[in-house]
A protein has these predicted regions:
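Surface-exposed loop and turn segments in beta-propeller and other repeat-based domains
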Residues: 77, 116-122, 163-189, 220-236
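Short loop/turn segments that connect beta-strands within beta-propeller blades
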Residues: 66-69, 108-113, 160-164, 216-220
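Beta-rich catalytic cores
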Residues: 58, 80-81, 124-127, 152, ...
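Blade-loop segments of beta-propeller domains
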Residues: 70-131
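Short, solvent-exposed loop/turn segments at conserved positions within beta-propeller repeat blades
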Residues: 52-59, 98-102, 147-152, 187-189, ...
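Residue-level detector of Asp-centered blade-edge/turn motifs that repeat once per structural unit
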Residues: 35-38, 87-90, 131-134, 196-199
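Secretory targeting signatures
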Residues: 1-23, 194
Length: 241
């Protein structure tokens, strides 16, 4: 199943991720499908929900498009955001849905349009989650500001649903200088993605650091890195890689 995360913007205007060039603007036109996809594509739309205010015309939404480009189904929720949506081995979907200062992670059954289970975390604005198997969920915990210490505790954790515990944790300030991206603040890393990439390795996307990294879960070492903080010729505050 192909997956794509589409994040609706919170402002009335739409800003492209690349510089706008009027001469290159040819307008929007229908695409042409030259061959069918291998399966459906599920898109998550962020929706609009801010400080208790919602816009009924901009709900958080999951949309499934079949292999031939036709709409299969939609699933809307109000008072929430949808970020990552990932396929699970059983054909269901893993969804990250922040709301009101917490994050709800749930398994969604496309056939019944119902949640199989859900977990609530005291985490704000969580974009990236990933299923690692054996009831383990990796969570990119951004905006984890430690006000009393004046430092960022932004991290990636692995939560085990079977035992209701965090069993692995990787904190960015243990691996980056404090002056990275201008120094600690309440959105220091904006880590927006976590994905398993091989045996015991995670791909992380600290957006504000202009880089994507691979971390060995056993040694906790950064074993691969693409990009450097401030070098926008390689990556410039990327979204999910």
């Amino acid at each position: 199943m192909a997956l794509l995360a589409l994040f609706a913007l919170l402002t009335p205007s739409i800003t492209a991720a690349v510089a706008y060039e009027p001469a290159a603007d040819t307008g929007l036109e229908p695409g042409t499908i030259h061959r069918s996809a291998d399966g459906p594509t599920v898109v998550s739309a962020q929706g609009y929900s801010f400080r208790g205010e919602t816009n009924p015309r901009k709900p958080a939404r999951l949309v499934s498009i079949d292999a031939d480009g036709d709409l299969e189904w939609t699933h809307d929720e109000s008072g929430a955001w949808f970020f990552e949506v990932d396929p699970m081995p059983n054909g269901n979907l893993l969804v990250s849905s922040p709301r009101d200062g917490e994050t709800v992670v749930f398994e969604f059954d496309p056939d019944t349009q119902e949640r199989v289970w859900q977990e609530r975390f005291d985490m704000t604005d969580t974009h990236g989650v990933a299923y690692l198997g054996d009831d383990r969920i990796a969570i990119a915990n951004m905006r984890e500001w430690n006000d009393s210490a004046g430092v960022s505790d932004d991290r990636v954790v692995v939560y085990n649903r079977s035992i209701d515990e965090i069993t692995w944790e990787w904190t960015f300030r243990n691996h980056y200088p404090a002056e990275t991206d201008g120094g600690y603040n309440d959105d220091w890393t904006h880590v927006n993605d976590v994905e398993p990439v091989g045996d015991g390795r995670l791909l992380l996307s600290p957006r504000n650091f202009d880089q994507a990294i691979v971390v060995d879960m056993e040694t906790k070492a950064i074993v691969e890195r693409l990009g450097t903080d401030g070098d926008h010729d390689v990556l410039d505050e990327q979204h999910s890689p």
